Amino acid sequence: MKPARLMKVFVTGPLPAEGRAALAQAADCEVEQWNSDDPIPRKDLEQGVVGAHGLLCRLSDRVDKKLLDAAGANLRVISTLSVGVDHLALDEIKKRGIRVGYTPGVLTDATAELAVSLLLTTCRRLPEAIEEVKNGGWSSWSPLWMCGYGLSQSTVGIVGLGRIGQAIARRLKPFGVQRFLYTGRQPRPQEAAEFQAEFVPIAQLAAESDFIVVSCSLTPDTMGLCSKDFFQKMKNTAIFINISRGDVVNQEDLYQALASGQIAAAGLDVTTPEPLPPSHPLLTLKNCVILPHIGSATYKTRNTMSLLAANNLLAGLRGEAMPSELKL
C-alpha cells in the first residue's frame, strides 16, 4: 500500500520542550522550523509557508492576506502561541475556511503575577532605588527619600475584567485595597462580586483610581483608548500599568503626562513597536518602567502554551476538535 502523504507543518521558531515533543511524535506530519530565537524575516516566512497544511506562529508573526496567498490552498490550520490574535487577519482567514487555535487560560496566572510585580516595582520606585545603591546615591537617609505609593486603602481601576483582570484583582485584594473599579464592554456582576468591584464609565475610573491596570483585549474600540484625555483625568499621584497591548495606549500622550508630572509613574510590559527602540523618549524617564513583554514568561507557562499550541495544530489537521479553538 502506498504510504499516506505527510502533512507539512511550518513552525516560525523554536518551541519549548513539551510542544516540540508533541510535534516530533506526529507521524502524519513533516515539520519544518525556523531555528532561531530571533524573529523570522518576512521573506523566509513567506517561503516557509508555501504548501503548508499547518502553521504554528508567534504573536510577532503577521499573518495577513499576502502570507495566506503565499501558503496556498493547502493551509487549513493556524495555531498561535499566544492568547492575543491581533496579528492574524481573521476576516481573511475565515473567508478561506482556515481554523485557528490559540492559548487562552494557561497564561492567566503568570501574566497576573507579572502585572502585580510591575505595579509594585513602579509604585515603590524599585529601579530608581537599585540605581541609587549602584551609583553611590545611598549616602544618607531622609524621611522622603525614595518614597513611593502604597496599595493599602487605595482605589484600583481595572480596564478589562476578563480572566487576567480578575486574577490581578484577586492578587491585589490582600494588600488592603479599599475599592475596585472596572470598565469594559458591559458589566460583569458575577465576576465582579468577588471583589465588590464597581462598573463605571472609563472617565470616572481614570479620575478616581490611585492605580490603573489595563488588561483588555486590543480591538477597534480599545485602540488608543488611553490617550491625552484619559491621562488628564487621572490624579497626579496615580500609577498607570499596561499589560494588554501597546496600541491601547497613545505613547506620545503618555510621555507628556509622565514628563510633565500629570501622573506619577507608569509601568509597561507592552509597547508599540516591540521591541521598543533604545532611543525612545519613554526610556529617558525615571518614572517609567518598561519590560520586554514577559507577562507569560515562566518555564511552566511557556511549556504549557507550546503543548497546547501543538495539540491545537495537530487536532485541526486531523479534523478533530481543538483543545482551544478561536470561534471565527
From Swiss-Prot:
GO terms for biological process: dicarboxylic acid metabolic process; glyoxylate metabolic process. Substrate binds at V83, G84, R245, D269, H293, I294, G295, S296. The modification Phosphothreonine is found at T298. The active site is at H293. The record marks E274 as: Raises pKa of active site His. Keywords: NADP, Oxidoreductase, Phosphoprotein. Homodimer. This is Glyoxylate reductase/hydroxypyruvate reductase. It comes from Mus musculus (Mouse). The gene is Grhpr.
